[in-house]
Each structure stands twice: as structure tokens, then as C-alpha cells.
């Protein structure tokens, strides 16, 4: 028995070292080769994007739709990019465990975007984005950031320990945090905001006219500006003005 276990250990070590693919239980394990390759893929007909698993998604807005993926050469074929009901889904193949040694990077050009979803440990970045309404959700420990957002309505949902950082302007923002997530938007100008925090989440935002806040747990909400504030606190949470 010990000999068999030792042989199994040697086999796994050799597979890892050589960037091989092995099957352990129901999952197909792919160990990154270390050699990075870039591939262009045609995508069209979407106004939403979802990143699953790990990786970095960089979004730019313009007149065309295009996707470029950089990853290790034996991992790249295992990355799915498909449009389903108007949503571009980016994720590993099902029943596949990717042990990458180099970052997985998606560069996505969009015409318009109404929704961004992040599930897992990934990272979504955009230098600027213009949308009438934007729904942004983070589930897990991932992070999302937009350098300059222009929107009429912004809806943000954070479930878990993820984080969202935004700057720019939105007429109205609706923020929902469940868990220990963080929302950083003190540089995002808004007129009205509705914030719901359940757990130990932390929220910082800028609002000028009206702020409605509900905190259940030990969460904190800090605001910049002089809005009228309506607050409900259940637990040890706090609502305070910055400065």
C-alpha cells in the first residue's frame, strides 16, 4: 500500500512539473505549462458580461466588440467564451480545475454594457464606462473597479468578501452588501442613494440630496456630502459623515 502511494506521489509530481493534465476524481486538473499564449476571439451581440473563476478582465468601451485572452498554452483551450441570451460568459470548462502559474487575462472591447457579474476570485477593471443603467455584482472574494463611470442608475450587489471601487457620477445608486464586502465610491458623485448592509460590510459613498440606509449587523456606512439621511440600524453598525 505504501509503495502504491509513493508511486502515485511520484506520478503527480512529474505531471505537475511537466505541465500535464491528470484526472483526480470528477475534476480534470490542468497544470499550467508556464508558456503564455495570446488568442483573439470573435464575440458579438451582448450587453452583459460574467467572469467566473479566476483571472483579470479589462474592459474598454468603443465602437467594436472584441475579446483577447492571454493564458498558458495548455490552459487557453480550457477557457470558455460564449454569448448566452445576450450575456458574454467567461469561465473555465465544467469539471475542470486550472492550476495556472501565469495570470489569465481577458481584454474585452464593448459597445455598450448594462451588466457586469463577477463570481469567484477574479478582478474586473475598466478605465471608463458610460451606461444608462449599470448592474454590477460581485459574489465571492473578487474585486471590481471603474476609473470613471457615467450612469443614471447604478445597482451594486456584493455577496461575500469582495470589493468594488468606483469614481465618476451616477444620478442614483442602490447598494446591497451581504457579508464582509467593501464598497469604495467616495469619488462617485450621486444625488440619491439607497444602502443595505447585512453583516460586517463597509460602504463609503458620496451623495448630495437623499441617503436611505439600513444596517443589520456590524457594518459601517460613511458618506461624503450633506444629504438628508434616513437610517435604520439593527445591531452595532454605524452611519457617519466623513471628516
Residue ranges and their predicted role:
Residues 1-243:
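Intrinsically disordered, low-complexity terminal regions
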